[in-house]
């Protein structure tokens, strides 16, 4: 049996040649002895009383820690760089953890960026650490109070070593605080620059998303236009199918049978022509279909208030009336040049010109796809804008191939308006209402009821289904009756009316079911009941002609030439004056948040009902490089924060409000 003492001996390496020896023999022998001794203790049986369980316990703990991936990576990295540390280690768990966690490989150190800051990371932490806790703030206050107490304590005579040492310490402390303040100032400046860079990046991202939203809304408008067209064609096809079914089930008469056999000599006589259905009569009997928008644009809601969306020259003369159905929808403008133009606000393009009136249009209203216009020729015309031959995808109108110049968007407001091809609005006229004796100055319609006011001092109620007048209201008689009840002088007098201003007798009106509000030149606002044809209430407060009004469920807002806007409470009849101007008010409208009015200036006056503040919006409030001053605003309309204003020079501006 071999001697067990020879089991731990290494073979004699001196027999190998020097050329074949690769590593040092002495180091290998030392490493071998350590491994052999450690293995002997670890592999020794547990029942052996000579074996020490300390190594087994240590290896169990080390094995549990070494199974962590992060610790293994650190150990392998440390073994590659400093293998002698692994040999010197006593296999202590805390020692191995400390070495593995505290060691940073060179690969990570090489990736540290070179900063251009004047202070180090530790200095920044040291300068900002007191601000993180309340204890740091209390410590600074205690130091400040301690200095005051030291200053108030017994004085040390100058020139002594104690005073010099004290002053040095105080100077060192102050210099340290001064250095920390400088570091904090640099840190604050760096944070501001970082915030500015982030804000710039966010602003760029916002612009990109706004462009994407604009593209989506344009595609949505085009698709909605196609859907409406398909729905119209489907409805016509369904009507034709129903008519064909009715004709198939209708028995033929003797005359029809004889005409089919050709027995009568006058096969295509005049009587037969009279029996044939007329295409024009069939289309005229067809009830117009109201088309409501399926979605509402929201692009303008993401712009700052007072941002100009578009400016275009709509007419050669002053704007007399304008209205639009929805943001980025259809707009109709009228001017003193007797032209009535229809616009696509999404593209800034003129769709067509409405022809029929023989004089200037003074008032108009757009509701869904219907348009009502009142003219100085004493007539009211109804139009269906959905029948316009217009292609929103490009510059083509209908199916005709025209030049692109016929439908350009007027980016330069000084450009002259280009007339679209003739006949693009030929199918839009519905019918004409004729009964007034003088020019139409105000109108409003809702559902099948239209009320118009004229310079003949009457109001007329119209049934749009039958196309006829159903009631006439005499404003002069109502004014005389009210005057007779209040004073012996029954003569109607125009109060506070400028001698050089010809105010309209009926300045504004609005109808809702059987309720009618009318503002006249005597400064009165009368509330009519259309069921009885009588004035139910008169609102007195304006000292000049009423030029504009609008009401909702609770409030009525009026504008007058007396340079004031009044808000009336319909429940109590009381009024407030939130806005006064220096010039007469010619146009006014409000939405859920704002009241806008045109008051003879180059800006639109805006009153925020929620915040209770006033501000100006328009070309006059924006610094531009134009050589000439903006013209006076004559008409203004607003819907959901989307405002359109028309000026005396024929330019129409579109703004966010």
Curated annotation (Swiss-Prot):
Q: Which UniProt keywords apply?
A: Coiled coil, Membrane, Mitochondrion, Mitochondrion outer membrane, Repeat, WD repeat
Q: Where are the WD repeats?
A: 314-355, 356-393, 435-474, 495-538, 541-578, 580-617, 626-657
The answer to keyword Repeat applying to this record is yes
Q: Where in the cell is it found?
A: Mitochondrion outer membrane
- Fetch the Gene3D superfamilies from UniProt: 6.10.280.220, YVTN repeat-like/Quinoprotein amine dehydrogenase
One Pfam family this chain carries?
WD40
Q: Which InterPro entries match?
A: G-protein_beta_WD-40_rep, WD40/YVTN_repeat-like_dom_sf, WD40_repeat_CS, WD40_repeat_dom_sf, WD40_rpt
Q: Which residues form a coiled coil?
A: 211-249
Return the Basic residues bias intervals: 284-293
User: What protein family does this chain belong to?
Assistant: Belongs to the WD repeat MDV1/CAF4 family.
What does the protein in this record do? Involved in mitochondrial fission. Acts as an adapter protein required to form mitochondrial fission complexes. Formation of these complexes is required to promote constriction and fission of the mitochondrial compartment at a late step in mitochondrial division.
This protein is called: Mitochondrial division protein 1
What is the species listed in this Swiss-Prot or TrEMBL entry? Answer: Chaetomium globosum (strain ATCC 6205 / CBS 148.51 / DSM 1962 / NBRC 6347 / NRRL 1970)
């Amino acid at each position: 049996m071999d001697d067990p003492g020879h089991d731990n001996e290494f073979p004699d390496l001196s027999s190998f040649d020097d050329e074949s020896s690769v590593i040092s023999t002495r180091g290998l022998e030392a490493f071998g002895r350590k491994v052999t001794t450690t293995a002997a203790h670890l592999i020794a049986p547990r029942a052996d009383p000579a074996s020490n369980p300390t190594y087994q316990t240590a290896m169990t703990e080390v094995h549990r820690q070494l199974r962590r991936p992060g610790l293994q990576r650190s150990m392998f990295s440390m073994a590659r760089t400093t293998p002698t540390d692994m040999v010197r280690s006593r296999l202590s768990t805390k020692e191995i953890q400390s070495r593995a966690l505290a060691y940073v490989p060179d690969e990570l150190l090489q990736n540290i960026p070179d900063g251009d800051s004047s202070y180090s990371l530790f200095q920044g932490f040291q300068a900002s650490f007191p601000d993180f806790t309340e204890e740091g703030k209390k410590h600074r206050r205690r130091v400040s109070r301690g200095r005051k107490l030291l200053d108030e304590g017994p004085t040390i005579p100058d020139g002594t070593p104690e005073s010099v040492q004290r002053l040095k310490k105080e100077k060192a402390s102050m210099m340290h605080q001064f250095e920390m303040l400088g570091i904090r100032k640099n840190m604050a400046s760096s944070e501001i620059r970082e915030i500015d860079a982030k804000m710039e990046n966010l602003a760029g991202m916002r612009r990109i998303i706004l462009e994407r939203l604009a593209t989506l809304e344009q595609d949505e408008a085009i698709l909605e236009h196609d859907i409406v067209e398909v729905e119209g064609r489907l409805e016509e096809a369904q009507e034709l199918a129903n008519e064909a079914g009715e004709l198939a089930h209708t028995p033929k008469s003797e005359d029809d049978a004889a005409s089919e056999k050709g027995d009568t000599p006058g096969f295509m006589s005049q009587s037969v022509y009279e029996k044939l259905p007329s295409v024009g009569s069939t289309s005229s009997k067809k009830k117009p279909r109201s088309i409501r928008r399926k979605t509402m644009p929201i692009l303008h809601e993401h712009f700052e208030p007072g941002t100009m969306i578009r400016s275009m020259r709509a007419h050669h003369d002053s704007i007399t009336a304008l209205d639009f159905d929805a943001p980025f929808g259809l707009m109709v403008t009228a001017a003193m040049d007797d032209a009535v133009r229809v616009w696509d606000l999404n593209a800034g393009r003129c769709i067509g010109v409405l022809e029929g009136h023989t004089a200037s249009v003074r008032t108009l209203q757009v509701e869904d796809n219907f348009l009502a216009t009142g003219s100085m020729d004493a007539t009211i015309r109804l139009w269906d804008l959905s029948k316009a031959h217009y292609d929103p995808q490009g510059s083509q109108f209908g199916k005709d191939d025209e030049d692109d110049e016929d439908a350009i968007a007027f980016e330069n407001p000084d450009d002259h308006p280009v007339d679209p091809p003739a006949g693009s609005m030929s199918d839009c006229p519905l019918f004409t209402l004729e009964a007034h004796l003088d020019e139409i100055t105000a109108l409003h319609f809702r559902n099948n009821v239209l009320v118009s006011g004229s310079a003949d001092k009457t109001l007329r109620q119209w049934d749009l289904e039958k196309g006829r007048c159903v009631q006439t209201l005499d404003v002069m008689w109502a004014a005389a009756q009210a005057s007779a009840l209040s004073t012996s002088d029954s003569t109607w007098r125009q109060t506070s009316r400028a001698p050089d201003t010809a105010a309209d007798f009926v300045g504004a009106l609005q109808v809702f079911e059987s309720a009618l509000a009318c503002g006249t030149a005597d400064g009165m606002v009368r509330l009519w009941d259309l069921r009885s044809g009588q004035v139910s209430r008169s609102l007195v407060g304006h000292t000049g002609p009423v030029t504009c009004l609008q009401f909702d469920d609770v409030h009525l807002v009026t504008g007058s030439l007396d340079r004031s806007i009044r808000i009336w409470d319909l429940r109590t009849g009381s009024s407030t004056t939130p806005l006064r101007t220096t010039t007469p008010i010619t146009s006014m409208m409000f939405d859920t948040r704002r009241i806008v009015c045109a008051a003879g200036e180059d800006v639109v006056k805006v009153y925020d009902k929620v915040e209770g503040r006033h501000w100006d919006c328009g070309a006059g409030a924006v610094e531009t490089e134009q050589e000439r001053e903006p013209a006076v605003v004559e008409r203004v309309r607003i819907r959901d924060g989307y405002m359109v204003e028309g000026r005396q020079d024929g330019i129409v501006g579109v703004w966010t409000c």
